Amino acid sequence: MHKTIFLLLSLLLPLFPSWGQSISGQIVDEKNTPIEYASIIGVSPLDTTKTIVSAFSKEGGYFVLDCSLHKNDTLRLKISCAGYKTFHTVVAANHTFEKPIALEESVIGLNEIVVSAYKQAITLADGKIGIDTEKLRLGNNDNVLDVLKRAPGVVVSHDAITVQGNEPLVVIDGVKQRMPMGILLTYLKSMPAANLKRLFIKSMATAENRLSGEDATIELQTKKMQTRGYNISNTIHGTLLRNNAFRWGDYIDIRARHGNLSGSATAGYVKSKLKSEEEERFPYEQHEKLINQKATRDKDAYFGVLNMSWMPSFLKGSLNYFVSYYVDDSRRKGKEAYNTDAVLDKLTEREINDWTDLLSTNIEYLSADTLKHQFKISYGLLAGSDDYAQTVNNSLGNSVNTNKTMDGHRHIIEAQYTLKRPKFVYTVGNQNYISKMNENVKSKNGSDFSMWETIMGLYMSGKIKLTQDLSLYLGARTEYAHYKYLVANTISRSKEWNVAPYLRLDWKASNNFSSSLYLTMKNTRPGYFSMLPGATYYSDNEYSVGNSFLKPSMQYDFKIQNLLFKHVVVSIGTRLRSNVFGNTYNIDNDGVRYTKPQNYANLLSIYADASIPFSFIQGKLNGSLYLYLRNLSFSHLAYDVLPSTFNRKNNWFANGNLYLSYKPTDNFAIFINPFFKTRNNLLQERRKGTMSIDMGMQYALPKNKDIAFALTIEDPFNQLKGEHLYNYGRFSVTRLTFPNTQCIRLSMTYSISNNGKQIKVNKNENDTSRFAK
């Protein structure tokens, strides 16, 4: 332990620099609401016509004037913003305002103010891509997933979100969304994009991230209420799919502010009936086997989210509370036909009922940012349960019942302190995760499984501003993990120590070129869901099982990300994972196929991607092109996986999409979105490439734009049929999937609000007119 702490300190001690002169502070209004895009100009006290330095206030109303290149001992500051009286003061050239600067509202009445400010549509700073979401929105009917589809480096499919191949952590207004991907997709698909303000994409982990499950981060910032009032929006949507399948739902969002209390409450319901069909072909003992599966799944999903912030003056900060609850009630009925050489062997009926609930809550105290110090502490709880039942009957008179329950919880305790100086930011923090998961297969004696997971993490990081345009981030994280397993009344334990260093170099070479270089290494642990040993049957011929003996995988990353001409994002990188874990395809002693997660190989990947936005016809025609290319190579394969592999070297894969929208008027817009992916060759699997297109339109009433309609057509030519080839060693299986992707979707959004004042921000045309107006 002492060696680990000494290593962390020795990594970060060289970060402390000699700090240059700067003036920093925060600008707020009389109600202590931060003011963004206020103009701060520093002039000579002897000659007020001579501007020495200037800046605009940023997110949260904060500003920093760099005075290191000027010899003036004092400066006269002029702080102004439309709708407020100009503020004047004289300060030293190395001064920090301990209290926020409160601007007095102008006596001129304001119903709606338009402020012009310098703000790029896309930025690359601190290793994150920042995006003004207004540039990605098509209209009031857009949901958050629609916006993410148009963001650089983000790929959204019907069952996943990835950032350069990584499943990201999603953070909304500082709250980590600790929910499974399927639940998260339902929530984001229902959340209106009109509530978004900024979007940040971090494609690499830093010391502040856990060593597993947080390789990328998508941070969503919603709009804040500037005055007392409320805003209510409701979206109802319906989707008609092929074969009489459907999906419909309703989502309501309420945002309000009263005095020092502000918050939002959301609730939603989604009802779906989806039909699926799969076909499998494989040779078996010199015969051709064919399995055809058809199923109908009915699902009811409910969710509610409450997010509140209380900022009384005596707290000297804010108390933030978040709670979400999700229920997923799924019922699946299917029929399976088993054939040998085109002769029917048997028919099987399979019925699955799966009820899941998940509660997530978090309370946090965040101290006021004094521009020198900031502290936060939080407690979170994640708790859920799952009740799974499967009944199988076949034409041979056999019957099997499987009943399985799971429940668990996780306590999360976090604390973080940040020390800020004009050219240096130092952060230290602690994160603790205390978890327990139980699984019980009721129909099988001795099947009880319990796992306790305790993780204690300590991290430190420092960011130093080497020059005006060059900064260095160094960080280190250590984690201690303790596991205890109870399997069939037998207890086993394991312990792990992990240390991970992080380096990032951010360079703004010019107004048209910014670059970030990343170098990290870390130990990635498997999630405990993949370690639960209970079996789940998908057909009479295949099941899946967990593996409680999975080992961590060491991961090394190197990446360069560039922002060209203020809009084009280009990156290239490589990742090496030793002793990587994942699902493998096997055959048991009875000749039945099964999948099982295990450590199976070393994996080297090399990748590159590019995102190119464009705008024509005075901003009426907008779009973006995204391309991704990756190469995989496997080595040092596990002995039991070796006989069942395809190509181990030079497995190339590419995908891309083009988003094109035309908005001739403020109340009407259309879009098309063609996309493709090539054949994807993995170690035991080959996936056939596909190509398809989505299209749609949005319309808002001319006299009442708070009422809007949207019509979307997805996969109109039914091209997203999946064709996979799996290698089980003794034979390979070809699986065809006919998904519910061809559909037409209609939605209507209605908003009502009561705000005393709204402030709209227009972008500087010299900066963003070529992207969009």
Language model features with spans:
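Face-selective signature of the C-terminal outer-membrane beta-barrel domain
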Residues: 301-330, 349-488, 492, 506-516, ...
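Short, acidic Ser/Thr/Gly-rich low-complexity loop/linker segments typical of extracellular
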Residues: 46-62
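Outer-membrane beta-barrel signature, preferentially recognizing the C-terminal barrel domain
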Residues: 493-494, 523-571, 576-578, 594-607, ...
